[in-house]
Amino acid sequence: MSTSAQPARRPFFRRRKTCPFSGANAPKIDYKDVKLLQRYISERGKIVPSRITAVSAKKQRELARAIKRARFLALIPYVIS
């Protein structure tokens, strides 16, 4: 048995995404900004979890509150049919 001289592969490193609402020119979370809120709602109308969107815990709470306010005021639908 001969061992081939292949270099060892580096393990795949998934880069940690940064929060889209933190930073200098980050958008403000506002319940009236329907276009921004729709990016964080699934095609079924559910709020997308922060592990997928990479939103920080604090901003995820603000985002959820803004989405719920916009739903209550009928700016965005509760369910998408």
Swiss-Prot record:
GO cellular component labels: cytosolic small ribosomal subunit
Annotated SUPFAM superfamilies: Ribosomal protein S18
InterPro entries associated with the record: Ribosomal_bS18, Ribosomal_bS18_CS, Ribosomal_bS18_sf
An example Gene Ontology molecular-function term: small ribosomal subunit rRNA binding
Keywords from the named record: Ribonucleoprotein, Ribosomal protein, RNA-binding, rRNA-binding
GO biological process, one term: translation
Domain of life: Bacteria
Keyword Transmembrane helix on entry: no
Family classification: Belongs to the bacterial ribosomal protein bS18 family.
Subunit structure, interactors included: Part of the 30S ribosomal subunit. Forms a tight heterodimer with protein bS6.
General function of this protein: Binds as a heterodimer with protein bS6 to the central domain of the 16S rRNA, where it helps stabilize the platform of the 30S subunit.
Protein name: Small ribosomal subunit protein bS18
Species assigned in the record: Parvibaculum lavamentivorans (strain DS-1 / DSM 13023 / NCIMB 13966)
Organism lineage: Bacteria, Pseudomonadati, Pseudomonadota, Alphaproteobacteria, Hyphomicrobiales
